[in-house]
């Protein structure tokens, strides 16, 4: 910048007046850009400081000043509509105002640039602002967009997206604009701090009226510093002004300025005292708040200790209960194993007992058969006697009937009866002769004898046999 100024001055000295004007305009533009960015940074800082004490809304002077500064930045060196209306018509973007042969009647606003460059932002509010009924002018829509973006905490995102679309930015702005220079990156970074503030705006207020331009109040950001040389020069000027009225100047003539200085010092002292009292009150409030927070912290710490102790006790109780349950499980498993072994042993003993108690038929020897036969005789002796008596009676009846029918054969019958008695007296009492207990003339007795011989029947000692030949026919 300094080189450009020096170049401009040399051009002026050499007779080049056109180069000097260009360098001067460039320097003025640079100063304007730097001032706007600096004021915007101060405005953002004051907004953040104010948000710590109250909610930021339309009535806040800090916000109104910030909105005016941002509007001035976005409108800095904005091209006229007539220069780019053909390109916008090619993109099928609706424009505000009426078209004439010379361009648009209404002036260009930064909203025309924002709604084109920020359409790529996800979930943008462009369509919502376009459809607002109470906002008609392009400038009013731009102001509404600033408020909505601040409430959504997306203003920095909108500006960053618009600045990345360099082609669109070049079409809307002239050379030397803030959005085309290095200051644009600083602007996006400054606006990022506004995402921490909660804004509350009414989109139907007078602030959206686009009939008047935005005016920046630089007063809060100005600071006057008076040097020692300027103070002495002011006193000399006061003496000169006091002596101009009369030739004989006395110290009384300079009295009123000193009185004014005393009043000013008194006012300064009064303001300092007020600030001190205010600071003292704030200090007392902060100390009280600190004590309250310390009490809350101590209570929280004590409660935390109690809860930690409860958790430790619960963990210990759970561990003990777990150990007891594991011990019970092991004991039950041992008991189950013992019961299974006892059951298996009982089954084996029962099987062995049953096997010894009831041997297989092939394992029986001759002595066992004889013992079985003796036991059978003992238990069935009475039955044998009854059978023999019935056999004798039956034989007598048969012989009588034959004698009565054939007297010639009676003698033969007597002989047969004697033979039968002899045989009955000399027979062997064994189970093999049980089939002969019936009548020899009975067919059923003969069949039972045949079946007995064929099966080698051996009666059990505990079984009572009923021969079909013993039943009288």
Curated annotation (Swiss-Prot):
Residues with Omega-N-methylarginine modification: 13
Keywords for this protein: Coiled coil, Methylation, Phosphoprotein
Expression across tissues: Isoform 2 is expressed at high levels in brain, thymus, ovary, testis, leukocyte, liver, small intestine and prostate. Isoform 1 is expressed in the brain, testis and adrenal gland. It is activated in tumorigenic breast cancer cell lines and in the primary tumor of breast cancer patients. Activation also correlates with metastatic lymph node invasion and can be detected in metastatic epithelial cells from the lymph nodes and in the bone marrow of patients.
Sequence ranges of Gly residues compositional bias: 8-21
Sequence ranges assigned to domain RUN in this UniProt record: 57-206
UniProt region (Disordered), positions on chain: 1-24, 399-428
Superkingdom, taxonomy of origin: Eukaryota
Entry-linked Gene3D superfamilies: 1.20.58.900
UniProt-listed InterPro entries: Run_dom, Run_dom_sf, RUN_RUNDC3B, RUNDC3A_B
Coiled coil: 317-342
Biased composition (Polar residues): 399-422
Residues that bear Phosphoserine: 232-233
Pfam families in the cross-refs: RUN
Family, similarity comment: Belongs to the RUNDC3 family.
UniProt subunit comment: Interacts with RAP2A.
Protein's name according to its UniProt entry: RUN domain-containing protein 3B
Organism: Homo sapiens (Human)
């Amino acid at each position: 910048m300094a080189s450009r100024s020096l170049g401009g001055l040399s051009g002026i000295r050499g007779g080049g007046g056109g180069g000097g004007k260009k360098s001067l305009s460039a320097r003025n533009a640079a100063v304007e850009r730097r001032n706007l960015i600096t004021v915007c940074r101060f405005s953002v800082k004051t907004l953040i400081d104010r948000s710590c004490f109250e909610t930021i809304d339309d009535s806040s002077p800090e916000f109104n000043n910030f909105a005016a500064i941002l509007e001035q930045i976005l409108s800095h060196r904005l091209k006229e509509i007539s220069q780019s209306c053909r390109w916008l018509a090619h993109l099928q973007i609706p424009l505000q105002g009426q078209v004439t042969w010379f361009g648009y009647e209404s002036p260009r606003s930064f909203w025309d640039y924002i709604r084109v460059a920020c359409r790529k932002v996800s979930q943008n509010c462009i369509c919502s602002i376009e459809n607002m009924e109470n906002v008609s002018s392009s400038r009013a829509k731009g102001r509404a967009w600033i408020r909505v973006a601040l409430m959504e905490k997306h203003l920095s995102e909108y500006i960053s997206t618009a600045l990345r679309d360099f082609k669109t930015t070049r079409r809307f702005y002239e050379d030397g604009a803030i959005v085309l220079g290095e200051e644009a990156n600083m602007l996006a970074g400054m606006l990022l701090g506004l995402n921490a503030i909660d804004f509350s705006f009414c989109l139907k207020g007078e602030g959206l009226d686009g009939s008047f331009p935005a005016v920046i109040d630089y007063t809060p950001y100005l600071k006057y510093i008076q040097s020692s040389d300027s103070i002495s020069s002011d006193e000399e000027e006061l003496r000169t002004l006091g002596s101009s009225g009369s030739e004989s100047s006395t110290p009384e003539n300079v009295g009123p300025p000193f009185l004014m200085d005393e009043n000013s010092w008194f006012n300064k002292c009064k303001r300092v005292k007020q600030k001190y009292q205010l600071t003292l009150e704030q200090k007392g409030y902060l100390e009280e708040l600190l004590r309250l927070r310390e009490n809350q912290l101590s209570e929280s710490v004590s409660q935390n200790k109690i809860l930690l102790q409860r958790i430790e006790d619960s963990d210990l109780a759970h561990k003990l209960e777990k150990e007891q349950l594991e011990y019970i499980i092991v004991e039950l498993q041992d008991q189950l194993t013992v019961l299974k072994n006892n059951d298996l042993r009982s089954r084996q003993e029962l099987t062995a007992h049953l096997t010894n108690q009831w041997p297989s038929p092939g394992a029986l020897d001759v002595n066992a058969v004889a013992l079985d036969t003796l036991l059978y005789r003992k238990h069935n002796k009475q039955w044998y006697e009854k059978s023999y008596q019935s056999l004798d009676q039956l034989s007598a009846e048969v012989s009588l009937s034959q004698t009565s029918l054939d007297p010639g054969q009676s003698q033969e019958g007597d002989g047969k009866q004697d033979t039968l008695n002899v045989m009955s007296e000399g027979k062997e009492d064994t189970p093999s002769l049980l089939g002969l207990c019936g009548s020899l003339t009975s067919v059923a007795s003969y069949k039972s004898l045949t079946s007995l011989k064929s099966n080698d029947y051996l009666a059990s000692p505990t079984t009572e046999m009923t021969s079909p030949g013993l039943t009288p026919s």
